[in-house]
């Protein structure tokens, strides 16, 4: 599931065979209704779970960070974001208060609170049939590619991410099919086959669902980064 700036919530649901059962958009109430209707689920949320707690400021933490990092002066972010940024992965920085957070983050915080009320437990929890965790779409695609993805939201970026999902085994259209449908006439007349290309928010929701699939069925192919106090992010660790 993804909370973003333009469309509050985009969600995807897949099963243990990777079949896509749902892919849609909606408001918080729609996401709440969708999650409330699940009796057994592992939800991956593409949004910060909480504000930063100042871990990066702590002396014992800073001693463990790279002394030569260009991020040395950054302190208003979570440790997990610092670690991802240090690897070169572009991720948003979470402020130290909800008031300072952008609207899409506030919606994400609210969703996590609602999940708790619905009886979802933080992953991993062997005693709960409904669990959730935080993931990060850009970082997930980076891990699967082994390098920085093309610009998020651009046509080439969406096609690249769709190809990553296809190669990972997700039942999405092979992105190369897009090029097979282009002719000189169609290009000149604005008739590109855009209906076969997933949007950036849909791709983030699908990679979140894929990460949940791996976490639930092949946990050895998932890595986690961060600290429990501020939030741990789970990412696929099986390059295509």
Please place each PLM-identified region on the residue numbering.
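RNase H-like (RuvC/DEDD) metal-dependent nuclease/polynucleotide-processing core
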Residues: 1-240
């Amino acid at each position: 599931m993804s909370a973003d700036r333009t469309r509050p919530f985009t969600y995807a649901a897949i099963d243990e065979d990777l079949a896509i059962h749902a892919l849609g958009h909606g408001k918080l109430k729609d996401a709440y209704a969708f999650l409330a209707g699940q009796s057994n689920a592992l939800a991956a949320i593409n949004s910060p779970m909480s504000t930063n707690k100042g871990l990066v400021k702590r002396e014992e933490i800073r001693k463990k960070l790279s002394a030569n990092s260009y991020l040395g002066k950054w302190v208003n972010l979570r440790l997990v974001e610092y670690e991802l940024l240090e690897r070169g992965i572009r991720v948003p920085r979470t402020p130290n208060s909800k008031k300072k957070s952008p609207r899409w983050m506030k919606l994400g915080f609210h969703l996590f609170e609602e999940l708790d009320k619905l009886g979802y437990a933080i992953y991993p929890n062997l005693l709960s049939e409904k669990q959730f965790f935080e993931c990060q779409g850009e970082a997930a695609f980076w891990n699967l590619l082994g390098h920085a993805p093309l610009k998020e939201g651009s046509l080439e970026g969406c096609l690249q991410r769709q190809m990553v999902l296809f190669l990972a085994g997700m039942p999405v259209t092979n992105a190369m099919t897009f090029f097979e449908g282009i002719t000189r006439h169609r290009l000149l007349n604005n008739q590109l086959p855009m209906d076969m290309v997933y949007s950036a928010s849909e791709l983030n929701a699908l990679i979140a669902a894929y990460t949940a699939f791996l976490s639930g069925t092949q946990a050895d192919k998932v890595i986690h980064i961060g600290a429990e106090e501020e939030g741990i992010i789970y990412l696929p660790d099986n390059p295509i």
